Amino acid sequence: MFILAVGIGLIFFYVVAQKTIDSSSQERMKTNVARQSEHLRTILNIHYSYLEGVAEKIAESNELMNEENKEVLTVFQKNTSLDRLALIDPEGNAYYDNGVEKNVSHRRYFKEGISGNRTLSDPLESSVDQETRVVLGVPVFHEDEVIGILCGSCNVGELSQMLFDDLFSGNGYSLIVTKEGKIVAHTGEPVDHKLSYGEDIFTFYESKTTREGHSIGEVKQNFAMGEEGLVRLAGYADGSDRYLAYAPLGINDWMICLLYTSPSPRDGATS
């Protein structure tokens, strides 16, 4: 009877400990996804503010595409972490700080910027050097009229560096994805799967088993509607579960995702 009682006690302890750890992990995930989202928005706002300062300088001249403003692009690009700066006229003709010229009137970021809004593109492959970049843009105002757009671009790898990489002590990673599930940026690597820009995360996660009545279909629906959530995934080679937490970034319908390995009661007791 004594051995039976000890056995029942150990089982009870394990169940309670696991629930406690699970609850703690979920709360940590929710906190971290909020931190990650706020951190990224803060960095992007710094870039926007910098571009708006340059745009004000450019707007002081009588002509948008004069030599003085082209020189301003070159000077200011050297003092920013953005790869390229470009000045775009109302017809979509863009002049870059390296002297390249092309028309971008078909781009979404041009249409948003010329309408007087800050803009951020989805990842685009550069026709100049074939690098994949995102473009930030701000309108250039002169007497309350939009006379052009000032844009800066950064490599998706640099966008990834804007994410915290120390949230999980090596037990997880962060993602920025489109509402369709395409990877925009990431930090950290899963041990059982290599991440690639543009990859559809649902293709990988659909091979996993969901816990607690959730489904990948539910996650897809939440992405499409811009809603936050958390799902527990099983089916990994090491036998452990993963938590996938996600929330809208508030920019471009992008989602911020965190994936974290669920600790066992033993891990929780020794951490």
Predicted regions and their residues:
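Extreme N-terminal signal-anchor transmembrane helix of membrane signaling/transducer proteins, especially
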Residues: M1-K19, S23
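Sensory beta-strand/linker motifs that couple input domains to effectors
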Residues: G152, I256-L258
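Short amphipathic alpha-helical segments
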Residues: Q26, K30, Y48, E52, ...
